[in-house]
Amino acid sequence: AYYEARVPGVPTMLLELLSHQNFADMRYGSDPRFKFLVSRAVYKGILRYISSQYGLPYVVQPLPVESLAVQFAEGGKAAVTWSPVMDSLETTAAPTGYVVYTRIDDGGFDNGRYVDNPCLLTAQEPGRIYSYKVTAVNEGGESFPSETVAACRMPDEKGTVLIVNGFDRVSAPLSVRCLLYTSDAADE
């Protein structure tokens, strides 16, 4: 059985992950965070297998950055900052640099600017909306992009407005667990 998996000339993986008869498994299967973790584990497994087949070292793609923020700085500039995320299970996944993508007004994002440190000080023209997203990079590749943040300095500004994105919940649809009621109250 499973001849393809037993012949070493063909890379094969049999993955039995979730049971459609287990409700808890189905909740995991709907959770985007779980899907990301499983996909990353499969990617790492394939990378390690191919690396061992050819006797070559490997470097795992870094994780996306977090805590992206943009604030006004002196001289009509903006400071874009973020924090790298380390993969506690994979030391090779540490970022060696970052790519900051910029969009002006409703245009498309540019091809990105490489930086070594988790910050970028950039000039902004008044009255234009500047949007930023960041990826982490290393020899293994480029991470998924961060969320997008934006800043706009008006020429006749009367103050500064700070917008805080406190929404970071990404999950499956809500699943409510109820107690089984055995009361005869409905029959009364």
PLM regions: where:
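Active-site-adjacent mobile loop/cap segments within catalytic or ligand-binding domains
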Residues: A1-Y54
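Short, glycine/serine-rich, charged loops/turns that create anion-binding
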Residues: S19, M86, G166-R169
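Short, solvent-exposed loop/turn elements at domain surfaces
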Residues: F23-D25, E90-T91, R169-S175
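Pro/Thr/Ser/Gly-rich low-complexity, intrinsically disordered linker/stalk tracts
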Residues: S52-T92, E142-E157
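Recognizes extended acidic, P/S/T-rich segments that occur
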Residues: A93-G127
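Beta-strand-rich modules
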Residues: Q124-G140
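Low-complexity, Pro/Ser/Thr- and charge-rich linker/hinge segments at domain boundaries
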Residues: A151-S171
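Conserved small/polar residues in nucleotide/adenosyl-binding loops
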Residues: Y181-D187
